[in-house]
Amino acid sequence: MKIKGCKRQSFLDQAVQNGGQPIFYLIKCWDKEESFFKLGITVNNILTRYGTVKAMPYEWQILLELPDTAEAVYDLEVKFKTEMQDYHYKPKISFNGSGTECYTQLSEALQQLI
């Protein structure tokens, strides 16, 4: 399976260049018509990343933040995207990561981390 989104070496380079703390995150997103989960990795603060309506056009809540090495958070993202490929969801309103990182359900392993 090909994992779309941030390429491993690109993310590792970005983490070194920005000097930020790599984080694997899971958020719940919703509005009056939709509810879904979005996972991802970042070296920025999640509140900064999704702090505007343009960046995140849905109501949202952080369910999980796991800071670790760039390699570890990248590998977590790939693992959970693979586990949850059958639950993939494309939200009606587009935002960064909405096409590849949203899901209707969570894997058991991810639920246990929350």
Model-derived features with residue positions:
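Non-catalytic accessory segments flanking enzymatic or RNA/DNA-binding domains
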Residues: M1-I114
